[in-house]
Amino acid sequence: MSRSSTSRRGSESRPELLSPAGSLEAFFAAMENGADAVYCGLPEFSARAKAKNVTFDDLDHMLDYAHERGRRIYVTLNTLIKEAELPTLVRTLADLEHLGVDAVIVQDAAVWRLARAHFPGLRLHASTQMTIHNAAGVRTLEKLGFSRAVLARELTLEEIAALRKQTRLELEHFVHGALCFSFSGQCYFSSWLGGQSGNRGRCAQPCRRRYRYQQQQGYYFSPNDLCAIDLLPDLIAAGVGSLKIEGRMKSAEYVAAVVGAYRQVIDAAPAQRKDAVREAKQALKLSFGRLPTRGFLTGPRPTDIAVPSVKGATGRFLGEISAAGRSSISFKTRDALHVGDRLRVQPRSDQAGTAFTVKTLNVGRRSAKQAPGGTLVNVPSPFENRFKKGDAVFKVSSRKAFTLSDAACRRRLKGAAPRPLPISLSVRLQNGQLQLKAQSGEVTLERSFDVSSFAAHKNPLNTETLKEVFARGGDTPLELAELHAADLPPVVIPPRELKEIRRTFYGELGGLIARGREQQRRAHLEQAQAALLPEKQAAAAKDARLTVALGSLRDLHLLNDPTVDRIIVPLVPHRAADIAAGAAKLRNRREQVIWDLPFILFDTTWQQARDAVRALVSAGFHSFRLNNLGHFELFDGVREREALKLTAGYRLFSLNSQAASAWKDLGVGEVTLYPEDDRENLAALLRRDTGVETAITVHGQIPLITSRIHIRGVRSDRPVVSDRDEKYIVQSRGGLTTISSETDFSLIGHLAELRAMGADRFVVDLAHVGAFSPRGKQILAAYAEDRPPAQTSSFNFERELV
């Protein structure tokens, strides 16, 4: 019985323009400049935890304001959830269903599982953090009850159009804003450096920093900003129904400028579109973004998406500090500068910048309100001894900024009419009584009222008269969706009596609906709370089982080692002949082999992967590790389906017991827990009986970034080095780029502790070094002794995953 909007969503004929609303001010900027919908976050579970975000009370009034204007609001719950946070998540879902939000945007399978089972009033959108990049992934979402997929930004227009033909699901795609170097949801860079996880909404953006490769400084991992304003007809033709603007961390001024520009182009008639695009591009130049790129939309190998010589900072570059005083800076400004503009100074060390608003401005020895481009200016700073000569100065907003205080925003929101609840009404007049039956959701009310009626000489009581009377809810926020009136006699009822009946009936109905909605909220909440798994009693430790991940089939004889229970080997779709040859060697060890499916599987290679899976199943292999939602369909129609042993890899995110249970619901028998996790959460998860086996990766090379972006001129034989002397290896293979630390991840040395928590299945990933290399042998020896290998990191295990 939620109060969701009935306004039309995006379609291929008229797309939805979807704007960020990281603050109340940005919400109004979006509304006033033509957004059809906005997405916003709450204080918890938002992938932009550093944004202002909104409260539940704010959201309630925002929904009133938006729905009154036929607009929609989607709420982001697109982070990974810790075990201890599940009770808060359940309460959040109950409140969002009660409020009637138009959809929630989801990453963690726990949110899907709980919403599907206990909060049916919530529409689900799959976040781009789920890395949906092929038709099989979209079709899987459709089967799971999602209504929309936010596609990976790595897809081309051609790939989107081909995908569109294979699904009826709503498709959403980013058209403007910051790009991640990595596939969204698959970056561990920030978390690796300090526990601030991008998948928990706290990315510290180390990709935007400057690095060194063979003494050449550059911004190797910093993409330019997406701008697809001249590709909107192509996106619509490809089947994208929602055009999304990135920027919940951006100012209201940015939102106003970008939404206004895209609205102008979307609404332009075909004959005027060229002029509209030209004007919109000019307006976008003032939005203080990075250099524009079309991203992958025009092809899989864009040359302008990441240029190492271009700074990764946002804002319009004004110049470098030529002189730094104790509390002022001097520089030659490239663009006009005004009192009221906001500046950010970026240190040459490439650490975080410092922002401040220009309060006074000096040109020469005179104070000025503004200075034209090309002028040497002196700007007093509120910070003492903070800046140095050579630091870069950026303008990040102008004096003309869209400004509205939070208090002013809330006053405007409270002026919106409460959202009416739709009702259907049946009316009958019989034996001097007006019989009414109303229904709204699960609530039904029937009442009879004595009325005075007179024979009608003209204009007898009819459906239109009744609609006119009962369409007005008065003080009760109800909306007449439909009215049925059967066999009305030719009489007249005094209008005053009809209005009094409406007032009495609607007053009772409104109270009944309110009580029913609250009872439904409590019932759904209690059901979901009861479904959360309790802690289980501690069980006796089982014998540890070791699985070793290999990089190729040449190390298959590792299975001769009695301490190795299983091996994981890569399934490479285009090398089916090699797979078949390797499979022949393994006929007697089939149950000890797990075939690892490639995480990224574009539609051009998906069928090859399916053929390889079927060939392996026919050869008697049953164990496969899945790493993306698009992998589940690979096993549809496979013979011996019931004999399959499917493992969920860590890229499917199992950070809590509900996510692990979700994979069980989909036929998975074992889940590999999330390597970003910390000690406390791992222990809490392992204390729950999810009904699936759990494995923990205890050693490996973590791919901090997986990307479709090719870095020209950078090879794997030399590291890319940070200003802190941290070294990273860049590898390119199969059209993908991976960036890994030279330092391995390892929990070896903590095995006894993990076993005490209840873990008994461990994965040692030696794909990057080889099982029989000196380093591989050292790691296996360290595992046998539970001794920490040299030069490794425990990632977040001993510190908190934030």
Kindly label every feature range from the protein language model.
Residues 138:
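Extended, positively charged loop/linker patches that create polyanion-binding surfaces
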